[in-house]
Curated annotation (Swiss-Prot):
Keywords, comma-separated and alphabetical: ATP-binding, Cytoplasm, Cytoskeleton, Hydrolase, Nucleotide-binding
Entry-linked Pfam families: Actin
Protein name: Actin
Compartments where located: Cytoplasm, Cytoskeleton
InterPro entries recorded: Actin, Actin/actin-like_CS, Actin_CS, ATPase_NBD
Hydrolase recorded as keyword: yes
GO molecular function: ATP binding; hydrolase activity
């Protein structure tokens, strides 16, 4: 879609990162942290053109003097004032568009409370004056991006993980499972186990350093116990990382102990099942006739599925739970970090989708509840 003058906007608001761009593009134009920062001390930033708040990368780069807040927790918006700041920043600073000129497709977590989708709808029409909008479920978009309409999506981002069985394009709500265990918890856990090694990471700014260590050095072991044995008997798994101040730290078994919590939440003191068992439970809640199609199409999505080794481990664990003759296939698309956004870009540019938008006129006639009738 060359004519950006009318291109729809696609905005995927995640707990950790916001992905935004134009429908029809193959990747988001803007990817920035879903953070709003406010100065810790009034007046400390003399001459820096004191603003009362910073969003995204700017908040990230000035993190040393700001208190950082994430308005989206566990995939669900909890702070609407800050969320509005993020949307404002998305339209005006990142995409540089006038929101009143473009339809906008937003994404939501599965099982998002009804009041939340109404609030999103209200803000788009009343604050930003959107001509049209739509709210789509994140996991469904990821499945579209993989070229399928049936499968089970394990979507794991920064704030929440979900297993969402989808049949012929429709999510099956009774079988959706939510796991409040995702990237941010793994970052916190890595902070904790690095402290046991004698390194101290505590502030919100230091957490960002640990997140970087996690993204660069962590991986999922195919056999956890065996990997622990290897790590104990040799230094072959050790890697070093240089901190911003030049200090070099070494990390060993932490590299795979951190993401292991996705399979063994008991590491974090949680009683829930791991992602493999949660996926299996989701499949078992579905009609017996479609399970075979789900087992053969387990699609990984979201940044927390980017750990090397996760697909093989998932394949191994689900195979152990499933009936012995069942064909199991775990699909890990290389672009899965952005597959929700990509699915949104595909959906919003389909000619058949154009009648699905909620128009400003429909909103004015029916109010925010229109979203439940038109988006499902």
């Amino acid at each position: 879609m060359g004519d950006e003058d009318i291109a729809a906007l696609v905005v995927d608001n995640g707990s950790g990162m916001c992905k935004a761009g134009f429908a029809g593009d193959d990747a988001p134009r803007a990817v920035f942290p879903s953070i709003v920062g406010r100065p810790r001390h009034q007046g400390v930033m003399v001459g820096m053109g004191q603003k009362d708040s910073y969003v995204g990368d700017e908040a990230q780069s000035k993190r040393g003097i700001l208190t950082l807040k994430y308005p989206i927790e566990h995939g669900i918006v909890t702070n609407w004032d800050d969320m509005e700041k993020i949307w404002h920043h998305t339209f005006y600073n990142e995409l540089r568009v006038a929101p009143e000129e473009h339809p906008v497709l937003l994404t939501e977590a599965p099982l998002n409370p009804k009041a939340n989708r109404e609030k999103m709808t209200q803000i788009m029409f009343e604050t930003f004056n959107s001509p049209a909008m739509y709210v789509a479920i994140q996991a469904v978009l990821s499945l579209y991006a993989s070229g399928r309409t049936t499968g089970i999506v394990l979507d794991s981002g920064d704030g929440v993980s979900h297993t969402v069985p989808i049949y012929e394009g429709y999510a099956l709500p009774h079988a959706i499972m939510r796991l409040d265990l995702a990237g941010r918890d793994l970052t916190d856990y890595l902070m904790k186990i690095l402290t046991e090694r004698g390194y101290s990471f505590t502030t919100t700014a230091e957490r960002e350093i640990v997140r970087d260590i996690k993204e660069k050095l962590c991986y999922v072991a195919l056999d956890f116990e065996q990997e622990m044995t290897t790590a104990a008997s040799s230094s072959s798994l050790e890697k070093s990382y240089e901190l911003p101040d030049g200090q070099v730290i070494t990390i060993g078994n932490e590299r795979f102990r951190c993401p292991e919590a996705m399979f063994q939440p008991s590491f974090l003191g949680m009683e829930s099942s791991g992602i493999h068992e949660t996926s299996y439970n989701s499949i078992m809640k579905c009609d017996v006739d479609i399970r075979k199609d789900l087992y053969a199409n387990i699609v990984l999505s979201g940044g927390t599925t980017m750990f090397p080794g996760i697909a093989d481990r998932m394949q191994k664990e689900v195979t152990a739970l499933a009936p012995p003759t069942m064909k199991i296939k775990v699909i890990a698309p290389p672009e899965r970090k952005y597959s929700v956004w990509i699915g949104g870009s595909i959906l919003a540019s389909l000619s058949t989708f154009q009648q699905m938008w909620i128009s400003k006129q429909e909103y004015d006639e029916s109010g925010p509840s229109i979203v439940h009738r038109k988006c499902f």
